[in-house]
Amino acid sequence: MIVRTLEEIEDTDADIKTENWRSKRIVLAREKVGFSVHETTLYAGTVNDFWYANHIEAVFVFEGEGEITDKATGETHQLKPGSLYLLNNHDKHQVRPKTDMRTVCVFNPPVTGREVHDENGVYPVIVEDEEEAAS
């Protein structure tokens, strides 16, 4: 059994901070459970273009408000506490938080925590090597 708190993750290599968002990676590929879990805050007034070409992502909003736009169709949905969006078709999307928006994100395949969005908003697939996974 693994038990973690967000406080334990703060200011570690699993606490990723950018100008637009902060993501605390709670469960990563090294746990070998087939998914990763992150608590991510997207900052008010930012525009975030993402495309998880190599991952499926589910996002549950538990604080704040914003909107998500499907970049293929132009369809926009309002996001508020209790909203969930599932990017089951590797959808290119844009998230625009009106207020700081706190979310729980689940990725499959799991991320390692070392991924960086490329120019298209894509995470590469990074496979944990066996030696790192054992530590």
Curated annotation (Swiss-Prot):
<dbReference type="Pfam" id="PF06339">
    <property type="entry name" value="Ectoine_synth"/>
</dbReference>
<dbReference type="InterPro" id="IPR010462">
    <property type="entry name" value="Ectoine_synth"/>
</dbReference>
<keyword id="KW-0456">Lyase</keyword>
<dbReference type="InterPro" id="IPR011051">
    <property type="entry name" value="RmlC_Cupin_sf"/>
</dbReference>
<dbReference type="GO" id="GO:0033990">
    <property type="term" value="F:ectoine synthase activity"/>
</dbReference>
<comment type="similarity">
    <text>Belongs to the ectoine synthase family.</text>
</comment>
<comment type="pathway">
    <text>Amine and polyamine biosynthesis; ectoine biosynthesis; L-ectoine from L-aspartate 4-semialdehyde: step 3/3.</text>
</comment>
<comment type="function">
    <text>Catalyzes the circularization of gamma-N-acetyl-alpha,gamma-diaminobutyric acid (ADABA) to ectoine (1,4,5,6-tetrahydro-2-methyl-4-pyrimidine carboxylic acid), which is an excellent osmoprotectant.</text>
</comment>
<dbReference type="GO" id="GO:0019491">
    <property type="term" value="P:ectoine biosynthetic process"/>
</dbReference>
<dbReference type="InterPro" id="IPR014710">
    <property type="entry name" value="RmlC-like_jellyroll"/>
</dbReference>
<protein>
    <recommendedName>
        <fullName>L-ectoine synthase</fullName>
        <ecNumber>4.2.1.108</ecNumber>
    </recommendedName>
</protein>
